Every structure is written in structure tokens, then in C-alpha cells.
């Protein structure tokens, strides 16, 4: 039951953004910025969608290692230089789909900058109210797109049973997201930890 709770928010948001908002196609190239729960769910969703290359980007090495478990084919540590340049080195011309799962101005701009001509950047992270992102206007001549995603554009009646089936088939990684189980009486201590 505790794993089912994960589907209700983070997994639905990440996998749904891949399936519904961006509609990632088999064989495509994907980059995910931010490897927390939603970012890992994007990576898992991209693998389920049949993406040919999935690039995980984060600044925490342990999160990048976990991203491999969820389906990342390549990892980029943001501490090692410009992630946009690193994505371009790996792909030649950028990715077809990028997902921003942090909620920062800089990472939203990077998500747009790392897509190739005709690519789509999907911003999932909650950028603070009043913050504006800046994009190069000429990039739109290359038919690049940027969009937001709210709860993965979910369709709960269809998605929930489908995600449960993926989990039962060993394709949706929920167990790996649970780092520790605690009793309700210990919740305050868990927040401190």
C-alpha cells in the first residue's frame, strides 16, 4: 500500500509528463534535469516509452547512480561543466525531449537550450511565482517548443490501473523509491533526519 501512495503524485507527474504531455516516441532521445522522485519517474517513463537514449542530469552522484536503475543510459554531473554542452557532446545536435524536474530559472532555460531542432522541452518543476525565464527568440525558427506539465497531464482512471500493471510486471520502479519506512508516531523525527 505504501508503494501505491507514490503513484498518486510523483510517479503520475513524471511518467505522465513523458506519456501524455510530451508523448515521447520509441527510439527518441531524452534528457531529464533533476533526479529526485519526479525526475526518476520521468526516466522510468522514458524507458517504458521505448526511448533510445535517456540522459540523467543532476549534481548529486548517488542520485545519478539511482537514475541508472530507473533506465538512464547516460549520466551527467552538473558539477562537471555546462550540462547543455555535455548533452550536445553526447548527441551531436541535442535531444528530442527534455524534462526539467527542479523548478529553477537556470534549469528551465537549460532544458530549452539542450533540445535539437523540432524538440520539446517540458517544464515540470515549480518555478517560483514572478520568476521569468529567458529564451533566445531565434530558436523558435527551428520549431523548438517549450511547455509546462501539471500532474503529468494525468488521466487517473486510465493511468492508475496502467501504472499498477507496470509495477506488478516489474517495469515501474516503486520499491527503489522507498528509502526507509517509519511509523506515524515517528514522523517529526523523520523530517529532522
Question: Model-found features: residue ranges?
Answer:
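NAD(P)H dinucleotide-binding glycine-rich loop of Rossmann-like/cofactor-binding domains
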Residues: 1-33, 168, 172
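Residues at the starts of beta-strands that form the adenosine-phosphate
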Residues: 29, 52-54, 120, 145
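C-terminal hydrophobic helical "lid"/dimerization subdomain
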Residues: 81, 93, 109-113, 117, ...
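Rossmann-fold dehydrogenase core element
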Residues: 119-122, 134-176
Amino acid at each position: 500500500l505504501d508503494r501505491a501512495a507514490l503513484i498518486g503524485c510523483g510517479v503520475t507527474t513524471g511518467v505522465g509528463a513523458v506519456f501524455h504531455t510530451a508523448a515521447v516516441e520509441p527510439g527518441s532521445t531524452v534528457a531529464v534535469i533533476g533526479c529526485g522522485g519526479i525526475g526518476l519517474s520521468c526516466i522510468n517513463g522514458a524507458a517504458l516509452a521505448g526511448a533510445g537514449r535517456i540522459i540523467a542530469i543532476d549534481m548529486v552522484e548517488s542520485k545519478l547512480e539511482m537514475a541508472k536503475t530507473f533506465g538512464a543510459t547516460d549520466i551527467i554531473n552538473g558539477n562537471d561543466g555546462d550540462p547543455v554542452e555535455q548533452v550536445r557532446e553526447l548527441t551531436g545536435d541535442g535531444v528530442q525531449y527534455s524534462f526539467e524536474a527542479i523548478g529553477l530559472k537556470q534549469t528551465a532555460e537549460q532544458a530549452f537550450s539542450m533540445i535539437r531542432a523540432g524538440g520539446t522541452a517540458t517544464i515540470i518543476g515549480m518555478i517560483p511565482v514572478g520568476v521569468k525565464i529567458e529564451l533566445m527568440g531565434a530558436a523558435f525558427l527551428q520549431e523548438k517548443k517549450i511547455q509546462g506539465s501539471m500532474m503529468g497531464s494525468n488521466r487517473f482512471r486510465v493511468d492508475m490501473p496502467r501504472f499498477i500493471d507496470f509495477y506488478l510486471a516489474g517495469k515501474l520502479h516503486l520499491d527503489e523509491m522507498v528509502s526507509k519506512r517509519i511509523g506515524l508516531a515517528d514522523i517529526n523525527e523523520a523530517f529532522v533526519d
